[in-house]
Amino acid sequence: MSLQASEGCPGLGTNVFVPQSPQTDEEGSRSGRSFSEFEDTQDLDTPGLPPFCPMAPWGSEEGLSPCHLLTVRVIRMKNVRQADMLSQTDCFVSLWLPTASQKKLRTRTISNCPNPEWNESFNFQIQSRVKNVLELSVCDEDTVTPDDHLLTVLYDLTKLCFRKKTHVKFPLNPQGMEELEVEFLLEESPSPPETLVTNGVLVSRQVSCLEVHAQSRRRRKREKMKDLLVMVNESFENTQRVRPCLEPCCPTSACFQTAACFHYPKYFQSQVHVEVPKSHWSCGLCCRSRKKGPISQPLDCLSDGQVMTLPVGESYELHMKSTPCPETLDVRLGFSLCPAELEFLQKRKVVVAKALKQVLQLEEDLQEDEVPLIAIMATGGGTRSMTSMYGHLLGLQKLNLLDCASYITGLSGATWTMATLYRDPDWSSKNLEPAIFEARRHVVKDKLPSLFPDQLRKFQEELRQRSQEGYRVTFTDFWGLLIETCLGDERNECKLSDQRAALSCGQNPLPIYLTINVKDDVSNQDFREWFEFSPYEVGLQKYGAFIPSELFGSEFFMGRLVKRIPESRICYMLGLWSSIFSLNLLDAWNLSHTSEEFFHRWTREKVQDIEDEPILPEIPKCDANILETTVVIPGSWLSNSFREILTHRSFVSEFHNFLSGLQLHTNYLQNGQFSRWKDTVLDGFPNQLTESANHLCLLDTAFFVNSSYPPLLRPERKADLIIHLNYCAGSQTKPLKQTCEYCTVQNIPFPKYELPDENENLKECYLMENPQEPDAPIVTFFPLINDTFRKYKAPGVERSPEELEQGQVDIYGPKTPYATKELTYTEATFDKLVKLSEYNILNNKDTLLQALRLAVEKKKRLKGQCPS
C-alpha cells in the first residue's frame, strides 16, 4: 500500500500522509473544497502542522494523530424567523460537537430581537482524523413551554484551514435574507499526539481509566457516612456513588482495588464533578441543612499513574488515579474474515473438493484454488420456511450436495431450522429424516399450553433473571421463549457460540443469521444496516466492526469491553432473528401500499444544502471528503407528532451497542467498503449513525428484503454459486428482484433479473449467471411452487389416481394452511410441504449439476487468468 502526501492544502491535510486505497466513484460525491458564498479566511502566520503517522484503512492499524483547539465565535444573526405570531423571537444558538463533547453549549438569550448579536466564543478540543460535524441550532426560548427549535446548521469542520480564521455567513433563507454569522479558528493543542486505532471507517481513540476512592476525614460510624455522588462527564459510567472509608489511601493500598472506575477518552477535556453532601447544624430547637454546589476538577492535568487528592467539603477527600487502558481492542476493526472463519474455510475446502469430485465424476482432484465457494441462501416465512427448508435440505442431502456447500445463510423462520440442526455437531452427515420427524412432532402439537399461567410464570422468572444479568428485556425475548416451548420439549441451554463444535473439522457449512439494524424513530426507508451473526463473530459489515459471538450483548466503550454479560441462550436469538412484532406503523404502511411516499415525505424534516461556489478562488482546495453544509428545518408540531406515532417500535430488540464511543474516520465516505453498503439517507449525517447510538435496534430482515444474500456478497467471501431457497408469501420473485435492484444501485456484482413476476408462470428452478461480470455469483433460484409435483410423486414417477390428492398443496390460496401467522400444522399438511420441497430439489438435479460445473469451470478460468 503506497502513501502519498496531499498537495497544496493549507487545511488539516498539510504535511499529512494519507493511505492510498481503492475508491468507488459515486454520483453526488461530496469531495472537494467548497466555501459558502460569504466564507472568508485569515492567515495567522503560525508554524507548520506536525506530521501524522499513517494508518491503513483496510486493517486495524495504530498511529499517532494530533489534536487541535477549535474556537467557535457566534457573532450574530440577521432577520431571524418568528416562532410566535405575536412576538419577536427570543433567540439563542446551541452548539453540539459530539466528537469533542456530548455536552451542548449555548449562547445567552437575546429577547424580542430580529437581529441578535452575541459575539460569544466557545472552545473545543478536536481530533483531526475523525469526522467532526458541528451542529449549530437556532432556538426560540420559551419560559412556559419547551423551547422552539427553528433550524440546525450542520457544518463539516474539515473545511477549516489550520491556523486561519474562517469567517462564515450561512444563508439560512435567501428569500427572507436570514443569515447566521460565525467565525472559526483552528490552532495547535498543547496535548501530545493521540494514539488511534482505525480501519478507515471507525476510529478508536485513547481511553484512560480513572480510579476514584473516597476517604472520610472524620472518625464517624460507617452507617452515618454518606455516599458521594461522583460524575465524570464524557465517561462510559457517567455517574457513580462512592462509599467513603476511614482507612488512609495510597496508590498501592487495597482501597484502589475496590475503587469506582470511570472509563473516559483521554483527550476529551473531561472533568470530575462531586456532589457535596449536605451539612447539618442545629441551634436550640432549630435544625437546618446547608448544601454547597458541586466541586469540579479537570482531568487533563492528571498524569498517568499520578494520585490526585481533591477535598470535598470539610468531611471528605477524593483520591483519584488515572491509568491508560490497553491499546488492544476487544472489537475487531477490519473488513477481512476473522482467523477462525478462514481456518474453517481451509478445512471445508477439503470436504467440498472431495464431494464435487464424486458428484461431478471428475477424473482429477480439484486444486485448492479451483474449489468454488458454494452457499445455500434461505429466506423467511415463519413455520412455512422452517418446514420447507427441512425438505430442501433433505433433497440436497440425497443428491450428495450438502457437502458441496460452505455456507448456509438464513433469516426469520429459516433460522429455526438452522439453530435446531446445529445442536448436532455432525448433522449434515446423518440422515435428516429423524430430525424432520422430530420437527413435525413439535409443529403439530397444541401450542396453547405454552400460554398457561404456570408457563407464563416461568417466562416471567426467566425474563427477570435476564434483566438482572444486564439485558434490556423486550417483547421479542418473550417471543423467543415462546418459540422454545413451541419447537422443543425442554429448556435449551445451547448458545450461538456452541455451534462452533459443528465447524471444528469443517464437517458442516458455516451458518450465518441475518438481521437489520434500525432506529426506533426512523423508517426503514431512511435507515437500516445489515447485521450478521455467525458462531464465530457478530457485527456490521458496513463499518467493518465485529465482536466474538459470546460477547454479543456485553457493554463496550471505544472498542474495549467494560462489562461482560453472560451470553444469551439460543432461544433469545431466535426471537431476535424472527422478530415479527418489531415493525413500526410507517414500515407496515410501506409494505402494504404503493403510495407510501406521501406519509414518508410529509412526516420528514426538511433538509437542504446551502453552500454555493466559493468567491475566493485563490484558496486551494482540499482533497478531503467534505460534506456539504446543510440546514435541517424540523417539521411542524403536527407532522412531528404524527411521525412519532408512525415510527415508534413498541417491540424492537435492543442490545448494548458495541460501537459505543467509536467515531467515524474523516474519510469514511470515501472508504470503498463503507460505500459498498452505503444505501440510506443518514449515511451522510455522521452524528446520527450507529456509533453514536446507545443501543442497537435489531429487526427481522424480511421487513426490508426477504433474503439473506448480503453476507455472501461481501468481497471477502465472494460466493461463486448461491442456491436460493425461497419461502416468502405472495410474489415468489420479489426477494430476488429486490436483491437484483439493490445490487445494481450499490454496484455489487450480481446476475440480471429476467424472470416473470407472476407466480402462475414460474418454473421449479432457474439458473442465473452473468458471463460479462466475472465477479457475479451464479444463482440457482428455487421458488416455493407446486408445479409437476401435482402429477409426480418422485422425479419420473407418476401418481396413481388415488395419489393425486397428495399432490394438491395449496401454498398461497386464501384458505392456505401455510400462512405465515400459522404456528401449527396437521401431520398431513407438514408432510406435503416437506415432500414438495424435497421433490423440487430432486427433480432439478440436472440444473444443479450444471450450476456446479459452471462454478468449477469459472474458478479454473479465473485461476488461468491470474499471473503465476
From Swiss-Prot:
Phosphoserine: residues carrying this PTM: 800
Span of domain PLA2c: 324-856
Keyword DNA-binding: no
Cofactor annotation: Ca(2+)
Domain of life where this protein originates: Eukaryota
Keywords: Calcium, Cell membrane, Cytoplasm, Endosome, Hydrolase, Lipid degradation, Lipid metabolism, Lysosome, Membrane, Metal-binding, Phosphoprotein, Transferase
EC numbers, comma separated: 3.1.1.4
Ranges for region Disordered: 1-46
Pfam families per record: C2, cPLA2_C2, PLA2_B
InterPro entries referenced in this protein's UniProt entry, alphabetically: Acyl_Trfase/lysoPLipase (IPR016035), C2_cPLA2 (IPR041847), C2_dom (IPR000008), C2_domain_sf (IPR035892), cPLA2_C2 (IPR040723), LysoPLipase_cat_dom (IPR002642)
Matching CDD domains: C2_cPLA2, cPLA2_Grp-IVB-IVD-IVE-IVF
Membrane topology category: Peripheral membrane protein
GO molecular function per UniProt: calcium ion binding; calcium-dependent phospholipase A2 activity; calcium-dependent phospholipid binding; N-acyltransferase activity; phosphatidylinositol-3,4,5-trisphosphate binding; phosphatidylinositol-3,4-bisphosphate binding; phosphatidylinositol-3,5-bisphosphate binding; phosphatidylinositol-3-phosphate binding
Outcome of mutating residue 412 to A: Impairs localization at membrane structures and N-acyl transferase activity
Broad class of the protein's primary localization: cytoplasm
Positions that bind Ca(2+) 1: 84, 90, 140, 142
EC category name: hydrolase
Catalysed reactions, semicolon-separated: a 1,2-diacyl-sn-glycero-3-phosphoethanolamine + a 1,2-diacyl-sn-glycero-3-phosphocholine = an N-acyl-1,2-diacyl-sn-glycero-3-phosphoethanolamine + a 2-acyl-sn-glycero-3-phosphocholine + H(+); 1-hexadecanoyl-2-octadecanoyl-sn-glycero-3-phosphocholine + 1,2-di-(9Z-octadecenoyl)-sn-glycero-3-phosphoethanolamine = 2-octadecanoyl-sn-glycero-3-phosphocholine + N-hexadecanoyl-1,2-di-(9Z-octadecenoyl)-sn-glycero-3-phosphoethanolamine + H(+); 1-octadecanoyl-2-hexadecanoyl-sn-glycero-3-phosphocholine + 1,2-di-(9Z-octadecenoyl)-sn-glycero-3-phosphoethanolamine = N-octadecanoyl-1,2-di-(9Z-octadecenoyl)-sn-glycero-3-phosphoethanolamine + 2-hexadecanoyl-sn-glycero-3-phosphocholine + H(+); 1,2-di-(9Z-octadecenoyl)-sn-glycero-3-phosphoethanolamine + 1,2-dihexadecanoyl-sn-glycero-3-phosphocholine = N-hexadecanoyl-1,2-di-(9Z-octadecenoyl)-sn-glycero-3-phosphoethanolamine + 2-hexadecanoyl-sn-glycero-3-phosphocholine + H(+)
Annotated segments matching region Required for localization at membrane structures: 857-868
Residue ranges of every copy of the C2 domain listed in the record: 46-170
Listed PANTHER family: CYTOSOLIC PHOSPHOLIPASE A2 (PTHR10728), CYTOSOLIC PHOSPHOLIPASE A2 EPSILON (PTHR10728:SF24)
Role: Calcium-dependent N-acyltransferase involved in the biosynthesis of N-acyl ethanolamines (NAEs) in the brain. Transfers the sn-1 fatty acyl chain of phosphatidylcholine (fatty acyl donor) to the amine group of phosphatidylethanolamine (fatty acyl acceptor) to generate N-acyl phosphatidylethanolamine (NAPE). Similarly can use plasmenylethanolamine as a fatty acyl acceptor to form N-acyl plasmenylethanolamine (N-Acyl-PlsEt). Both NAPE and N-Acyl-PlsEt can serve as precursors of bioactive NAEs like N-arachidonoyl phosphatidylethanolamine also called anandamide.
Domain notes: The N-terminal C2 domain associates with lipid membranes upon calcium binding. It modulates enzyme activity by presenting the active site to its substrate in response to elevations of cytosolic Ca(2+).
Protein name (Swiss-Prot/TrEMBL): Cytosolic phospholipase A2 epsilon
Organism in which the protein naturally occurs: Homo sapiens (Human)
